């Protein structure tokens, strides 16, 4: 594993070995064997974070390409029904950012720990509530939350039904959208979304970090 990582990253073998040890000690990798014959597999914890130009994602295959290349390999041991739900929710949210945000960059992330899987899709676009309010001629962005909750509104009628966010918000144990200074969490009264302590979205969306 160290040899492959060294070749792909350009880091020294010592640097790679240190990182592998840190990942194993932290639970992101699981060791097998001892000494120089050690092998590794995915640990109980999983993590991925990517920041890319929106146009670049579209040119490379869109949301399904990101899923197949980045998330699916980290979630191979999920139950098929759970993996299907995760796939739908992630690709729907990423598709929304790609097709509707008009932003330059998209931040995507996943963290799995203690049986709890969290995902993030964020962009630097105009904001979903602001866009809905403008498109529907609403005088207050808060009314956009009501339109969104109905699951029948889309700002791009050609090819979109408006059901993606509606369905995703109900298939997940927790779901929230933050935009234009507002927050939509359909389960906030009963089971509010857990904190995402593993990511700082605002810091991660800095343009200088785009790849």
Give the role of each language-model region.
Residues 92, 97:
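Catalytic glutamate of the conserved HExxH
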Residues 1-91, 103, 133:
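Bergerat-fold GHKL ATPase/HATPase_c domain
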Residues 30, 35-52, 98-211:
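Conserved beta-strand-loop-beta-strand hairpin that lines the nucleotide-binding pocket
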């Amino acid at each position: 594993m160290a040899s492959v990582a060294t070749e792909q990253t350009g880091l020294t073998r010592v640097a790679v070995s240190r990182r592998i040890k840190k990942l194993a000690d932290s639970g992101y990798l699981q060791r097998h064997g001892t000494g120089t014959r050690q092998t590794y597999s995915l640990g109980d914890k999983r993590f991925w974070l990517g920041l890319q130009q929106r146009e670049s994602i579209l040119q490379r295959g869109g949301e399904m390409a990101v899923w197949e290349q980045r998330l699916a390999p980290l979630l191979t041991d999920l139950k098929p029904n759970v993996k299907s739900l995760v796939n739908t929710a992630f690709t729907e949210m990423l598709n929304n950012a790609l097709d509707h945000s008009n932003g330059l960059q998209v931040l995507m992330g996943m963290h799995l720990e203690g049986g709890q899987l969290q995902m993030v899709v964020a962009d630097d676009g105009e904001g979903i509530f602001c866009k809905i309010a403008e498109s529907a001629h609403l005088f207050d962005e808060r009314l956009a939350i009501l339109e969104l909750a109905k699951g029948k509104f889309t700002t791009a009628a050609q090819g979109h039904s408006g059901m993606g966010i509606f369905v995703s918000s109900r298939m997940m144990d927790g779901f929230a959208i933050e935009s234009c200074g507002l927050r939509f969490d359909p389960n906030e009264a009963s089971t509010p979304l857990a904190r995402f302590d593993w990511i700082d979205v605002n810091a991660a969306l800095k343009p200088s970090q785009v790849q």
